[in-house]
UniProtKB/Swiss-Prot annotation:
The active site is at D246, K268. Its EC number is 2.1.1.107, 1.3.1.76, 4.99.1.4. It catalyses: uroporphyrinogen III + 2 S-adenosyl-L-methionine = precorrin-2 + 2 S-adenosyl-L-homocysteine + H(+); precorrin-2 + NAD(+) = sirohydrochlorin + NADH + 2 H(+); siroheme + 2 H(+) = sirohydrochlorin + Fe(2+). In the N-terminal section; belongs to the precorrin-2 dehydrogenase / sirohydrochlorin ferrochelatase family. In the C-terminal section; belongs to the precorrin methyltransferase family. The modification Phosphoserine is found at S126. Gene3D superfamilies: Cobalt-precorrin-4 Transmethylase, Domain 1, Methyltransferase, Cobalt-precorrin-4 Transmethylase, Domain 2, NAD(P)-binding Rossmann-like Domain, Sirohaem synthase, dimerisation domain, Siroheme synthase, domain 2. This is Siroheme synthase.
């Protein structure tokens, strides 16, 4: 870290600005907005700067070191490099922080790009290395941060003591503020400057006093790429106090979990349940009973070939509140990253998702229906069962030459796509690792031309496409 970000209180503090032109004008606006007691030294002044300095000090002179006396900060904002260098040297000798505009090497501090939602302030800097990138980031942040953010912060400051007195424990207070800060109704009241109504909203919410109970939120983490996590999913994992996660949740998604949340790996993976389901249920319930906000984080979509419904049924039986945040399932995410459309006007009018890992005493699927030629068949957790799947599909009429694709670790930098035909599927599966998705149908051949993520896809077991 080349610079330590700091916020300086300049109200009524002495600040010296050397320069009187356009460059100095821009800095003067910032310093005056911060309440500085400004002294400007320059042979002449920009007309607008003259107006700004009413109530402040202007010295019509060239800079000398004597003007540094009693100053907290110094800004050199001239277009004369020699003068700027002289100011920097004198300030360094006097042990006063100095900024030379557009010259970080001579500066002991620099001005960041500022997004002002006072009292909320956001500062962005590249240390002078990438000013265009900083400008782009500032524009994005300006669009992202609502204009009422400052009013929201001021309102929270006004209510802080009342909330602390009413809600005795820190968990209840945090939940109150999270609800307030996420409320569309409160946001609308502040955006439209209905301050009395905003105050009443706060009073009503505080009176409700429902912030102590636990809850369970079932969140789909998506297929691997952290960019595919939904916005609501991100919000939930950043508000969680306890997170129970599967092996299929990528490290990149786990890195987005709130830092002080308790993380518990329950290790679920096809055929390998390191924590039995009844123990997972009890972990969820016990933490929720203790008043915690618990997130059950599952790979893909939580209701797609997982046991999310069973977990929520356990919560319902205990009377524990719950909610669900859907995620992008592997059938949608992995196929898209492999360049395989699930449906196509010419060859696939439907798509069917099945699991290759069923209960041992479960009924056989309808293989005749699954072998239909005008549909895409997507199989989750099908590596181990691929020989039996291949045999049954061919026996029920699916062509042995039907294109197939096996997508390993879809949407991640370690994605591999193995291409072949249905009759080659068992051999392809021998070279694949979990998690993998099997796609059977004419659309699988389109990966040859529609592949976009990391490289081209080739056919045949001998061509393992590593997209890392």
């Amino acid at each position: 870290m080349d610079y330590l970000p700091l916020f300086a209180r300049l109200n009524n503090r002495a600040v010296l600005l050397v320069g009187g032109g356009d460059i100095a004008l821009r800095k003067a606006r910032l310093l005056l907005d911060a309440g500085a007691n400004l002294t400007v030294v320059a042979p002449s002044l920009h007309e607008e700067l003259t107006e700004l300095l009413v109530g402040h000090t202007y010295i019509p002179s060239r800079f000398t070191a004597a003007y540094l006396n009693d100053q907290m900060l110094v800004i050199a904002a001239t277009d004369d490099e020699e003068v700027n260098a002289e100011v920097a040297a004198a300030a360094d000798a006097a042990n006063i922080w100095v900024n030379v505009v557009d010259d970080p090497d001579r500066s002991s501090f620099i001005f960041p790009s500022i997004i002002d939602r006072s009292p909320i302030m956001v500062a962005v800097s590249s240390g002078g290395k990438a000013p265009v990138l900083v400008r782009m980031l500032r524009e994005r942040l300006e669009a992202l941060l609502p204009k009422h953010l400052g009013a929201l912060a001021n309102l929270s400051g006004e209510w802080r003591n009342q909330i602390k007195q009413k809600l005795g424990d820190i968990t209840s207070r945090r939940r109150f503020w999270e609800k307030a800060f996420a409320s569309p109704q409160l946001a609308t009241l502040l955006e439209t400057e209905q301050h009395d109504s905003a105050e009443q909203w706060m009073a009503d919410q505080l009176q409700a006093d429902d912030y102590a109970g636990g809850e369970i939120v079932l969140v789909g983490a998506g297929p691997g790429d952290a960019g595919l996590l939904t916005l609501k999913g991100l919000q939930q994992i950043q508000q969680a106090e306890v997170v129970l996660y599967d092996q299929l949740v990528s490290p990149e998604v786990l890195n987005l979990v709130r830092r002080d949340a308790e993380r518990i790996s329950v290790g679920k993976k096809a055929g390998h349940h390191s924590v039995p389901q009844h123990e997972i249920n009890e972990l969820l319930l016990s933490h929720a009973r203790a008043g915690k906000r618990v997130v059950r984080l599952k790979g893909g979509d939580p209701f797609m070939f997982g046991r999310g419904a069973e977990e929520l049924q356990a919560a319902r039986a205990e009377g524990i509140p719950f909610s669900v945040v859907p995620g992008i399932t592997a059938a949608a995410g992995a196929t898209a990253y492999a360049g395989i459309p699930l449906t196509h006007r010419d060859s696939a009018q439907s798509a069917v998702f099945i699991t290759g890992h069923c209960k041992q005493d479960g009924e056989e699927p309808d293989w005749a229906a699954l072998a239909a030629s005008n549909q895409t068949l997507v199989i989750y957790m099908g590596l181990i069962g691929s020989p039996a799947i291949t045999e049954r599909l061919i026996a029920h009429g699916r062509r042995p030459e039907t294109p197939v694709a096996l997508i390993e670790r879809g949407t991640t930098v370690r994605q591999r796509v193995l291409r072949g035909t249905l009759q080659e599927l068992p051999e392809l599966a021998k070279d694949a690792h979990s998690p993998s998705l099997i796609v059977i149908g004419e659309v699988a051949a389109l990966a040859d031309t529609l592949s976009w993520f990391g490289g081209d896809t080739a056919s045949g077991k001998e061509h393992l496409i590593n997209l890392a």
